[in-house]
Amino acid sequence: MTPDWLLWQIADSAFPAGGFAHSAGLEAAWQAGQVRDGDSLPEFLAVGLSAAARGVGIFAAVTARTPQRFGEVDAACDLFLNNHVANRASVAQGQAFLRVANEIFGSAALERLGKLVRRERLFGHYSPVFGACTAALGIDPPAACRLFMFMFLRGLVSSAVRLGIVGPLEGQSLQCRLSPRAEELAGILHAASMEDVVQTLPLHDLLQGAHDRLYSRLFQS
């Protein structure tokens, strides 16, 4: 299978990695009134994209370039995700993504990664797993960074639609308008190193940490 086909298959919403069970803090922000309606949603998505490109996305970029650093990057990701909701969601998504990728693609490199996570009792966070999996499948790092940002944006937009903040057509229009920004951030992500990791959205982090205390919730995080 060519790298392009692999990209399309992983980007397909039918790829069963469990990402749609998570809202990346949007549900908590919605209930807290930080996102009030469709008019305030674009700003939330834009700052969320920037935060991902300067935070968790860097872990994916580093393991996409240097998968042999997976253990080190995975441990750093665990330290970075210091709110328990985001940390738990990242581990759940990462282990699900690795398991599904192994079952679907049957790559020897993916199998070795799965054994490493189990043998060393690593966390298996989503971002480093994502990058290492793309490297194992022969997807070049710039394409992996673009795929990461696309999937992050698509996940946020999908969450907004399911929460009823916007409708499906408005959601797709919003995704289209934000795509150039996501593309720009993917370029920044590709050039980033571990020393560049930073939390640019502490309020978002606090809101996401309160997700477990919501009276009613649609998403796991």
Residue ranges and their predicted role:
Residues 1-221:
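Metal- and O2-centered redox machinery and metal/ROS homeostasis
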